[in-house]
């Protein structure tokens, strides 16, 4: 109806991201052995159908742009380059409007701001921070961001907009606000923020300013993908003691949750010479997206500690030598089919670790060469049926709604791939329908 395009070409294997000519895949645990016992696997992950060269980003526009254009065709007034700064409340406590700062539409300032902010977004997202030359692209991005902020500082006008039927806060989360992350989720402060420049927590602050309450502010989703290359997932992931704690083939958000929430943010992939050789070969598979190849090679070359024996590796990294030896022997036995794996890992996804030298790759929250992408889950508490923001007594604040990452939502306890679009569409429609029903 709105011209957002999807495609049925499917990628059936485990992967952090499908090849660029596949648009339906498994962004979850459905292919993991222990999960397959509970439910038949189904590829539920849809990428928007758009040809984007070799880039794995920028696909959201294929969904957003048609929805935006449809809304504009229906009469929506869109205020570009406008920031909400304050809510207006009447004597009964109802939210009736918002104070905004706007760069005048069509002005020279607006033209320059649009150009600068687009360039800032391009360069800031160009390379993961650990990759060579990332400091250069990030520096260029910050240069353009400062130019855009300078225009904001002198070129904006104050306006008040009346909200006759309701006001919806949907400004994203707060992962790009270091102070908020440090306050609410300090264990993830060294992760790599995964969001847009707008994820500053502004909507949460606005809601709190009129009595809105928050929840789950310390809940963070962390994404630790180690496949590709499959050789890493075929090896073992251990904690600071040298113990396994998970099936290594689980979805990246599941592995990241285990590491960040249950292992003190510290974990390593331990693999042997055979796995290292296989990983180099797999990194050059033409089916990989460039960022998968580059990150794999970077970590194979720079992110490892190496030793001739398991015991020497344990001493070098700081594992308990006896624990690491027992972990590897138990894993090798399960990989050979001599005993079941305690984490129900599929034997087809296991390779014995027998050929020295042995390697340990840091996949912790603070890993230097393998940054851990993180997003925020917490936000304003809302009434489930309507999306109205709740106050300290658990009562709805009249006229004030919240949606998306600004609010606590269906997926605020655990990551579900695609939650940003899916939850925004669902929670936005819920608020709109409640407003429409109230005015019938």
Task: Label the predicted regions.
Residues 176:
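Glycine-/small-residue-rich beta-strand-loop submotif within the FAD-binding core of flavoenzymes
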Residues 1-157, 165, 179-181, 196-200, ...:
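Mobile, glycine/GP-rich and aromatic-enriched active-site lid/loop segments adjacent to catalytic centers
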Residues 161-173:
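Short hydrophobic core segments
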Residues 179-204, 407-439:
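A conserved FAD-binding loop/helix module that cradles the flavin
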Residues 72, 172, 208-211, 436, ...:
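Hydrophobic/aromatic-lined pockets within catalytic cores
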């Amino acid at each position: 109806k709105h011209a957002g395009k999807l495609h049925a070409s499917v990628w059936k294997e485990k992967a952090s991201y499908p090849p660029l000519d596949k648009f339906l895949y498994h962004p979850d645990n459905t292919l993991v052995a222990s999960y397959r016992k509970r439910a038949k696997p189904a590829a539920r992950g849809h990428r928007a159908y758009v040809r984007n060269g070799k880039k794995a980003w920028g696909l959201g526009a294929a969904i957003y742009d048609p929805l935006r254009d449809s809304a504009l065709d229906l009469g929506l007034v869109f205020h570009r380059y406008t920031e909400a700064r304050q809510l207006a409340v009447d004597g009964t406590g109802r939210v009736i409007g918002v104070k905004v700062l706007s760069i005048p539409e069509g002005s020279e300032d607006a033209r320059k701001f649009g150009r600068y902010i687009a360039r800032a977004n391009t360069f800031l997202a160009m390379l993961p921070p650990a990759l060579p030359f990332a400091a250069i692209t990030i520096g260029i991005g910050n240069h353009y961001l400062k130019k855009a902020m300078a225009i904001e500082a002198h070129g904006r006008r104050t306006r008040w907009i009346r909200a006759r039927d309701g006001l919806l806060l949907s400004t994203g989360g707060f992962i790009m606000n270091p102070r908020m992350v440090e306050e609410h989720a300090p264990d993830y402060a060294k992760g790599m923020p995964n969001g847009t420049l707008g994820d500053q927590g502004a909507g949460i602050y606005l809601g709190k300013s009129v009595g809105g309450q928050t929840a789950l502010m310390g809940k963070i989703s962390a994404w630790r993908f180690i496949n590709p290359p499959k050789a890493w997932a075929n090896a073992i992931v251990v904690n600071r003691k040298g113990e396994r704690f998970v099936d290594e083939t689980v979805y990246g958000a599941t592995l990241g949750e285990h590491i960040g929430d249950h292992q003190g943010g510290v974990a390593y992939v331990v693999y042997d010479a055979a796995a290292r050789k296989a990983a180099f070969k797999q990194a050059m598979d033409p089916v990989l997206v460039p960022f998968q190849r580059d990150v794999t090679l970077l970590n194979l070359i720079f992110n490892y500690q190496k030793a001739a024996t398991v015991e020497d590796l344990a001493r070098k990294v700081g594992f308990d030598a006896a624990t690491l030896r027992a972990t590897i022997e138990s894993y090798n036995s399960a990989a050979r089919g001599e005993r079941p794996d305690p984490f129900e890992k599929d034997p087809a996804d296991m390779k014995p670790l027998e050929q020295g030298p042995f390697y340990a790759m840091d996949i912790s929250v603070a890993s230097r060469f393998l940054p851990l992408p993180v997003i925020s889950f917490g936000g304003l508490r809302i009434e489930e049926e309507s999306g109205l923001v709740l106050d300290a007594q658990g009562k709805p604040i009249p006229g004030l709604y919240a949606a998306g990452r600004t609010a606590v939502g269906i997926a605020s306890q655990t990551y579900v791939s695609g939650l940003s679009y899916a939850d925004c569409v669902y929670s936005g429609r819920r608020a709109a329908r409640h407003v429409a029903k109230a005015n019938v």
